[in-house]
């Protein structure tokens, strides 16, 4: 039996993780969850799974859930804030922490979980983007597995199993291309949030949907792959694959390419991470190769989708630059969703902040938190938010 904590249990990944646990009750037990403020969803989770601990970040949501548990004589202990997230990430009885919260908020609980010897099922890209070197070194120090939950890194992880790192030539990360695949800059001038949120293949949260539309999501995955698999940026390629059947590939020095293929369904990488190193029977629709008419691959347009280009630049620069990129992107996406900036301004703001805030500093926890705060305060004043 594996005991599980889910950070971000009410979001897209968290909800699908609950689906996996629901199907595998004999092997997986939900011990603790966190959420921001979706108290109605949290109450439903408490009713069904009866976790020992629940954390809410927002004060009003915390009070509502706490009152519900008291009134209904439910034993779930309700905690709040970052202190609560760290507490449930370091519980002695927990084996695996699923980090599916969005943004920098996942960084400190993930590091604390690693220091407590927990395996990490990682869906929070920002943790590795801003502090990848620190996270990976901590994982090695504490003999902890970092198990990627997203489809691309989960695919690469599987393609690398049983092979030697020195035999790898290139990692090939696939991208669906998002809702604006094939568009040029001039065609994206009047894009509204409702257009950018319509992903052709995946049902995701609002922030990651916008990142997919700008290809920033793929840029974050490139940086993540660099740290997860120890491969130079020159050897991490992005290809646009609109069918989303090939989830990523590894090219070896002898010319062989190993690809992981599956029906696009996030439950598969989640299930693989939670059951690692074993594979379990899945309810995911199997691939029918007779129905797959074609698989196509295209070169990404980095001029139109500037955030992808900037992610490569930030990764190669290293230090705190990925943290600057990430902080600026989180704010820029929020500004776009609120109608305060245009779609193409997202890339412009990333470029502006990278130029303004770069310092030759090691990516320590203190440094990345500090520079992230600087970027957010600057953009907050600029746009009065």
From Swiss-Prot:
<protein>
    <recommendedName>
        <fullName>1-deoxy-D-xylulose 5-phosphate reductoisomerase</fullName>
        <ecNumber>1.1.1.267</ecNumber>
    </recommendedName>
</protein>
<dbReference type="Pfam" id="PF13288">
    <property type="entry name" value="DXPR_C"/>
</dbReference>
<dbReference type="Pfam" id="PF02670">
    <property type="entry name" value="DXP_reductoisom"/>
</dbReference>
<feature type="binding site">
    <location>
        <position position="151"/>
    </location>
    <ligand>
        <name>1-deoxy-D-xylulose 5-phosphate</name>
    </ligand>
</feature>
<keyword id="KW-0414">Isoprene biosynthesis</keyword>
<feature type="binding site">
    <location>
        <position position="152"/>
    </location>
    <ligand>
        <name>1-deoxy-D-xylulose 5-phosphate</name>
    </ligand>
</feature>
<dbReference type="InterPro" id="IPR013644">
    <property type="entry name" value="DXP_reductoisomerase_C"/>
</dbReference>
<dbReference type="InterPro" id="IPR003821">
    <property type="entry name" value="DXP_reductoisomerase"/>
</dbReference>
<feature type="binding site">
    <location>
        <position position="13"/>
    </location>
    <ligand>
        <name>NADPH</name>
    </ligand>
</feature>
<dbReference type="GO" id="GO:0070402">
    <property type="term" value="F:NADPH binding"/>
</dbReference>
<feature type="binding site">
    <location>
        <position position="124"/>
    </location>
    <ligand>
        <name>NADPH</name>
    </ligand>
</feature>
<feature type="binding site">
    <location>
        <position position="152"/>
    </location>
    <ligand>
        <name>Mn(2+)</name>
    </ligand>
</feature>
<comment type="function">
    <text>Catalyzes the NADPH-dependent rearrangement and reduction of 1-deoxy-D-xylulose-5-phosphate (DXP) to 2-C-methyl-D-erythritol 4-phosphate (MEP).</text>
</comment>
<keyword id="KW-0560">Oxidoreductase</keyword>
<dbReference type="GO" id="GO:0030604">
    <property type="term" value="F:1-deoxy-D-xylulose-5-phosphate reductoisomerase activity"/>
</dbReference>
<dbReference type="GO" id="GO:0030145">
    <property type="term" value="F:manganese ion binding"/>
</dbReference>
<keyword id="KW-0464">Manganese</keyword>
<feature type="binding site">
    <location>
        <position position="217"/>
    </location>
    <ligand>
        <name>1-deoxy-D-xylulose 5-phosphate</name>
    </ligand>
</feature>
<feature type="binding site">
    <location>
        <position position="150"/>
    </location>
    <ligand>
        <name>Mn(2+)</name>
    </ligand>
</feature>
<feature type="binding site">
    <location>
        <position position="37"/>
    </location>
    <ligand>
        <name>NADPH</name>
    </ligand>
</feature>
<feature type="binding site">
    <location>
        <position position="176"/>
    </location>
    <ligand>
        <name>1-deoxy-D-xylulose 5-phosphate</name>
    </ligand>
</feature>
<feature type="binding site">
    <location>
        <position position="221"/>
    </location>
    <ligand>
        <name>1-deoxy-D-xylulose 5-phosphate</name>
    </ligand>
</feature>
<feature type="binding site">
    <location>
        <position position="212"/>
    </location>
    <ligand>
        <name>1-deoxy-D-xylulose 5-phosphate</name>
    </ligand>
</feature>
<feature type="binding site">
    <location>
        <position position="12"/>
    </location>
    <ligand>
        <name>NADPH</name>
    </ligand>
</feature>
<dbReference type="InterPro" id="IPR036291">
    <property type="entry name" value="NAD(P)-bd_dom_sf"/>
</dbReference>
<feature type="binding site">
    <location>
        <position position="11"/>
    </location>
    <ligand>
        <name>NADPH</name>
    </ligand>
</feature>
<dbReference type="GO" id="GO:0051484">
    <property type="term" value="P:isopentenyl diphosphate biosynthetic process, methylerythritol 4-phosphate pathway involved in terpenoid biosynthetic process"/>
</dbReference>
<feature type="binding site">
    <location>
        <position position="218"/>
    </location>
    <ligand>
        <name>1-deoxy-D-xylulose 5-phosphate</name>
    </ligand>
</feature>
<comment type="pathway">
    <text>Isoprenoid biosynthesis; isopentenyl diphosphate biosynthesis via DXP pathway; isopentenyl diphosphate from 1-deoxy-D-xylulose 5-phosphate: step 1/6.</text>
</comment>
<dbReference type="Pfam" id="PF08436">
    <property type="entry name" value="DXP_redisom_C"/>
</dbReference>
<feature type="binding site">
    <location>
        <position position="10"/>
    </location>
    <ligand>
        <name>NADPH</name>
    </ligand>
</feature>
<dbReference type="InterPro" id="IPR026877">
    <property type="entry name" value="DXPR_C"/>
</dbReference>
<dbReference type="InterPro" id="IPR013512">
    <property type="entry name" value="DXP_reductoisomerase_N"/>
</dbReference>
<keyword id="KW-0479">Metal-binding</keyword>
<feature type="binding site">
    <location>
        <position position="126"/>
    </location>
    <ligand>
        <name>NADPH</name>
    </ligand>
</feature>
<feature type="binding site">
    <location>
        <position position="125"/>
    </location>
    <ligand>
        <name>1-deoxy-D-xylulose 5-phosphate</name>
    </ligand>
</feature>
<feature type="binding site">
    <location>
        <position position="205"/>
    </location>
    <ligand>
        <name>NADPH</name>
    </ligand>
</feature>
<dbReference type="InterPro" id="IPR036169">
    <property type="entry name" value="DXPR_C_sf"/>
</dbReference>
<feature type="binding site">
    <location>
        <position position="221"/>
    </location>
    <ligand>
        <name>Mn(2+)</name>
    </ligand>
</feature>
<keyword id="KW-0521">NADP</keyword>
<comment type="similarity">
    <text>Belongs to the DXR family.</text>
</comment>
<feature type="binding site">
    <location>
        <position position="199"/>
    </location>
    <ligand>
        <name>1-deoxy-D-xylulose 5-phosphate</name>
    </ligand>
</feature>
């Amino acid at each position: 039996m594996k005991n599980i904590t889910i950070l971000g249990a009410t979001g897209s990944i968290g909800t699908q993780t609950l689906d996996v646990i629901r199907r595998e009750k004999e092997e997986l037990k939900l011990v603790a969850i966190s959420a921001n403020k979706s108290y109605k969803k949290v109450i439903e989770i408490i009713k069904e799974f009866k976790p020992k601990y629940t954390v809410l970040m927002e004060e009003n949501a915390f009070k509502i859930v706490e009152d519900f548990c008291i009134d209904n004589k439910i034993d779930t202990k309700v905690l709040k804030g970052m202190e609560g997230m760290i507490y449930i990430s370091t519980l002695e009885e927990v084996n695996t922490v699923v980090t599916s919260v969005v943004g920098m908020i996942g960084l400190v609980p993930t590091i604390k979980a690693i220091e407590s010897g927990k395996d990490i099922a990682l869906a929070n890209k920002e943790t590795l983007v801003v502090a990848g070197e620190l996270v990976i070194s901590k994982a090695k120090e504490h003999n902890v597995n970092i198990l990627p939950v997203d489809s691309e890194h989960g695919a690469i992880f599987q393609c690398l199993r049983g092979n030697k790192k020195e035999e790898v030539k290139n990692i090939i990360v696939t991208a669906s291309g998002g809702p604006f695949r094939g568009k040029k800059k001039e065609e994206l001038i009047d894009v509204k949030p409702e257009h950018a949120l319509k992903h052709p293949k995946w049902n995701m949260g609002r922030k990651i949907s916008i990142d997919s539309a700008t290809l920033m999501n793929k840029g974050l995955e490139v940086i993540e792959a660099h740290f997860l698999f120890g491969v130079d940026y020159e050897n991490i390629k992005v290809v646009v694959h609109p069918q989303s059947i090939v989830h990523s590939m590894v090219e070896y020095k002898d010319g062989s390419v190993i690809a992981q293929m599956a029906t696009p369904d996030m439950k598969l990488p989640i299930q693989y991470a939670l059951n690692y190193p074993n594979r379990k029977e899945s309810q995911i629709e199997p691939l029918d190769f007779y129905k797959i008419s074609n698989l196509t691959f295209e070169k990404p347009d980095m001029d139109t989708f500037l955030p992808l280009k900037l992610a490569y630049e930030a990764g190669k620069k290293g230090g705190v630059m990925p943290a600057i990129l990430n902080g600026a992107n989180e704010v820029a996406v929020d500004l776009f969703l609120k109608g305060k900036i245009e779609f193409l301004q997202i890339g412009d703001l990333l470029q502006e902040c990278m130029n303004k805030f770069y310092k030759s500093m090691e990516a320590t926890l203190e440094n990345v938190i500090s520079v992230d705060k600087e970027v957010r305060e600057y953009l907050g004043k600029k746009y009065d938010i």
